[in-house]
Amino acid sequence: MMIYTDDVRKKLDAILKAFENYIDDQNYFDIVYSKKIGYVWIVVDEPGAAGAEQLDTPEAMLDNLFNDIINDVIAPRSTTHLDEAHTLTESEEAECRRKITAILEQIEGGADEYLDYLDEYIKDYQERYAGGSKS
């Protein structure tokens, strides 16, 4: 049974390699590979409360990683609890872009495609949490 096409698997592997240090530094999630269902995002911050999400596309993997980095910028886990997501301030957005771009630029041959995806992701993120008030 083939879970991914060769092309998709290469993209996922390249993303994972670029984000490897970031993922290794986090103690509350991991991305593992299963021969049966492919890459899986596992939440591991509370033993027994682990949740899992199948990452079936490069975009699904990036969505989770981008969201995690954004949450980390808005509310670092060590100091605050993220009660409610909100639109990013200019400085938060700049910090998120800086952190994510530095990682994406390590992806051979795919950086431009993923940087465009980051632009779309942040735009969607801002619209999602704008709550009707256009600033």
Predicted regions and their residues:
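Short acidic DE-rich linear segments
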Residues: 130-135
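Negatively charged, low-complexity tracts enriched in Asp/Glu with abundant Ser/Thr
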Residues: 1-26
